[in-house]
Every structure is written in C-alpha cells, then in structure tokens.
C-alpha cells in the first residue's frame, strides 16, 4: 500500500495544477487517472485546439498547456497511476484508503477530485447508418488536424467546440459549413465575433436553422451531408468530413457511489474551500458544482489553490499555515 498526503483523481489541467499547489505546500501527491496518458480532455479530445483564456498566453494549444503544467509540477515528484479508475473508498477518522481498478491501494489524508467530465463519450446525432462512416469520414474528437487539409467539412453544433474548430480548420480546409439549429451560438462572444468575420470572407458558410438529417456516401467515404429545417426544406452540403460537436455524456462512474451529494453528474461542494459533504474530500474543476460556478480552467486553478490551503491543517495535524509567496517557495525547491 502506498502512503501519501494527497490523492488527486484526474490529471487534466486542474488536477496537474493541484499537484503543483500541493507541492508548494510541502504535500506529497499520488494521481489516479483512467486514461493511459496524463492531460484529461486536453490530450484525449482536443490536443491541437487553441485555448485563449489562460493568463499570459494570447493562445496556447491544449497539448502545450498540459506539457507546461506537467513540467511545473515535476519538481515535486508526483506518482501517477494511469489507465485505472478510483473504484473503492474506505473512510477512517483521519485518513482514507482508496482502491483502484488495478487493485492499487493508497492511504491518504486528503482527496482532491479533479475528474473533469468523469468518464466521457460523445453525444452522437441520431442519423441512420452513422457508424459506417465513423473513424473515416465522421470524427467526434480531433487529434491531428492535418488530416483535414483541403477538405470540405461540415461542422455541426453551436457551442464552443463547434465554433472554435470551425475557426481553426478554416485555415486549412477548402470549405467549412457550420450547421446549427438556431441563429444564435452559445460559444464565447469573441469566438462568435471571429466566426462571423470569417463567414463574411466565404471561408465558412453558416447554415443556421438546420439540423443533420442524413448522409450520402459509399464505403465509409462521405460525399454529402443532408440537412433539414423546421419547414422540412432540404439542403445537400457537398462534404467529405462531418464533425458533430454536441457535447459529452458525463458519468462519474464509481465516484457516484462514494456518498457525495451529486447533482446532474456533478459533485456539490461549498463555495469557500470546495469541500464535499465528506470532510477531507474536495472537488475542483468541471466536476464540482456550487452557486456561481464558472466552468473555466482558470477557475479550476483558483479552486485548487483554495482547497489545498484549506487542507493543509488536516495533512499536518492541525498545524497553522504560514503563508509565503511562490517566489520564495519555488526557488527553495529548485
């Protein structure tokens, strides 16, 4: 059995920043993640997607953000347990025992849940025979945007993923159609502004008021995407790629049975220290819910700092935390 101060469940950007924050406070960390590599959705779903709201970076690719966060945490020697889920929790007065799907046992004083969307998968559009085109002409996640060079692409959806990928791929695609059932998009205001600006050039065509209806192709190769509006008007869009972005199915998995207050696959926490209803267990990032919650990476970073400062006295048996600025702490570590 391993013995540590903090167990962090999830190795996305918020989980990695929590490793750094814990290290700055002198806490040892073990990290559990169901994926084979660290990085969460940033690596698994959109490694090449640019993120625009990280301080000091006008834009940064998701995979580069993870690389930098991993490097920032590395001096504190975290132990990663990858390709396994946290499955069982045993509570004791002043510590927890966690068991994983690979029978790894870890004893820890504090648990930080930074599981993002939990176990995730795409919400697929209800189109007949869609499976025949998946992986060849239809993709729900983008790991390598170069495969779309010179293609005619239908992007479907109205949120951040759909709008951001339409903008990004417009730089290399021959033509982009963005299909959305409404006239208004729910993506970030600046992203929508960029989208409409590019649409004026003709590089992106906004097909609003329409929904996906059918597919036309042969041997897994798409030739066109058929869309329909509320009046049953049909349009055939010449395209060899379809990218549906209708969000993710969220599933807390075994965590749902650990006794937390759960609301719509999110763990409820207080909005001071982000502690769950179980003392010593915190939830941060997208998995956490509280009044006023903003689902931003930078919000998760702040939650990591607050929760770990609050956890300090539990880890060190009631010892008061003497606050220091990061300059002094990190230079001492180096």
UniProtKB/Swiss-Prot annotation:
SUPFAM superfamilies: FAD/NAD(P)-binding domain
Organism, scientific name: Rickettsia prowazekii (strain Madrid E)
Subunit structure: Homodimer.
Catalytically driven reaction(s): 2 reduced [2Fe-2S]-[ferredoxin] + NADP(+) + H(+) = 2 oxidized [2Fe-2S]-[ferredoxin] + NADPH
GO MF annotations in UniProt: ferredoxin-NADP+ reductase activity; flavin adenine dinucleotide binding; NADP binding
Binding site for FAD: 33, 41, 46, 86, 120, 286, 327
Cofactor notes: Binds 1 FAD per subunit.
Protein name in UniProt: Ferredoxin--NADP reductase
Pfam families membership: Pyr_redox_2
């Amino acid at each position: 059995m391993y013995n540590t101060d903090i167990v962090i469940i999830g190795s996305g950007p918020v989980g990695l920043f929590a490793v750094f924050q814990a290290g700055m406070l002198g806490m040892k960390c073990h990290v559990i993640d169901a994926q084979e590599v660290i990085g969460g959705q940033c690596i698994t779903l959109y490694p090449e997607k640019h993120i625009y709201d990280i301080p000091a970076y006008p834009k940064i690719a998701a995979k580069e953000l993870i690389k930098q966060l991993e490097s920032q945490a590395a001096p504190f020697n975290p132990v990663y347990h990858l390709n396994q889920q946290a499955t069982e929790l045993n509570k004791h007065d002043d510590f927890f025992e966690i068991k994983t799907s690979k029978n790894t046992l870890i004893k820890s004083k504090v648990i930080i849940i930074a599981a993002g969307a939990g176990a995730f998968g795409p919400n697929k559009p209800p189109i007949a025979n869609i499976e025949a085109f998946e992986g060849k002409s239809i993709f729900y996640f983008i790991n390598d945007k170069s495969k779309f060079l010179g293609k005619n692409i239908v992007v479907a959806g109205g949120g951040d993923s759909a709008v951001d990928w339409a903008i990004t791929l417009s730089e290399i695609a021959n033509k982009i159609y963005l299909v959305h059932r409404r006239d208004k998009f729910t993506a970030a205001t600046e992203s929508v502004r960029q989208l409409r600006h590019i649409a004026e050039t003709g590089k992106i065509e906004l097909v609003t008021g329409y929904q996906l209806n059918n597919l036309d192709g042969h041997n897994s190769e798409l030739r066109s995407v058929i869309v329909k509006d509320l009046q049953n008007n049909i349009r055939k869009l010449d395209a060899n790629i379809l990218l549906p972005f209708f969000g993710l199915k969220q599933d807390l998995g075994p965590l749902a049975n650990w006794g937390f207050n759960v609301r719509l696959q999110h763990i409820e926490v207080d909005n001071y220290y982000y502690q769950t209803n179980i003392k010593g267990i915190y939830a941060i990032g997208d998995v956490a819910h509280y009044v006023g919650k903003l689902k931003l990476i930078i919000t998760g970073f702040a939650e990591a700092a607050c929760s770990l400062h609050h956890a300090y006295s539990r880890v060190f048996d009631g010892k008061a935390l003497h606050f220091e600025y990061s300059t002094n702490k990190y230079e001492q570590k180096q």
